[in-house]
């Protein structure tokens, strides 16, 4: 059975692929939306990093920072090391005990297991990558999700699932 560790390694690999793709993308794509009033691609990319900061906070208490909005390829490229660091926090937590964590969310106390937070990180990123790919396709651009899937990850990294 595929492990949470493999899923998180795939997430980290996929994040690097996505942010590399956008580090060479034309500026117009960062403002594209699925519909009026929906988040543009750049905001969704920034949200991926912001969410990872939230997971890091939930796991180890490190507060998040204000992230520079991704509005062009240059800013997207700046996120490559940020995503590497944030993904490493997730990977560092996979070997720890699956204990219940207490999270202070602006005064509201939330209880969640470590595995729940790590699983949510994987699923959440996949959902938004699908959303981003759909927005791009709507506007004549292409982000090939098959090149980002777990099969491609295993083939490229020659890892055992």
PLM region spans:
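Helix-adjacent hinge/juxtasegments
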Residues: 57, 61-99
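Short, contiguous alpha-helical
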Residues: 5-69, 106-161
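Mid-chain, well-packed structural core segment of small domains
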Residues: 90, 96-105, 110-114
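Active-site rim elements
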Residues: 1-7, 76-77
């Amino acid at each position: 059975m595929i492990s949470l560790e493999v899923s998180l390694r795939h997430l980290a690999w996929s994040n690097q692929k996505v942010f590399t793709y956008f580090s060479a993308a034309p500026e117009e794509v960062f403002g594209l939306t699925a519909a009026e009033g929906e988040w543009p691609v750049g905001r969704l990319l920034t949200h991926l990093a912001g969410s990872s900061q939230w997971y890091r906070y939930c796991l180890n208490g490190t507060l998040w920072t204000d992230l520079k909005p991704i509005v062009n390829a240059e800013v997207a490229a700046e996120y490559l090391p940020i995503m590497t660091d944030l993904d490493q926090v997730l990977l560092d937590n996979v070997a720890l005990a699956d204990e219940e964590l207490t999270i202070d969310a602006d005064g509201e106390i939330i209880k969640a297991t470590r595995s729940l937070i790590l699983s949510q990180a994987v699923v959440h990123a996949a959902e938004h990558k699908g959303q981003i790919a759909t927005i791009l396709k709507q506007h004549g651009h292409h982000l090939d999700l098959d090149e980002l899937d777990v099969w491609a990850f295993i083939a490229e990294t020659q890892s055992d699932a």
